[in-house]
């Protein structure tokens, strides 16, 4: 499945729009405690465990969004936007875009 932040896919024609699709995931408060407890893994000013947790959450949100696009009959998602929001000591990662069929 093609996933892009752009409104179209160069060299491909959008033949159908299937609607907005989203995917969300939440990292709970315990993950923050665990990450900060393991802060000693910081190398070069970067927290590896924290980056890994964020990457995993982002991939989960994107995967969920792609699954929803497939359910609607799409083979691509355009106009993808990723948002990160802190809610009551939890981090929500959400992905949204438009499911489309491309030729």
From Swiss-Prot:
Origin superkingdom: Bacteria
Segments traversing the membrane: none
Pfam families: YbjQ_1
Family: Belongs to the UPF0145 family.
HAMAP family found in the cross-reference section: UPF0145 (MF_00338)
Protein's UniProt name: UPF0145 protein Pden_3965
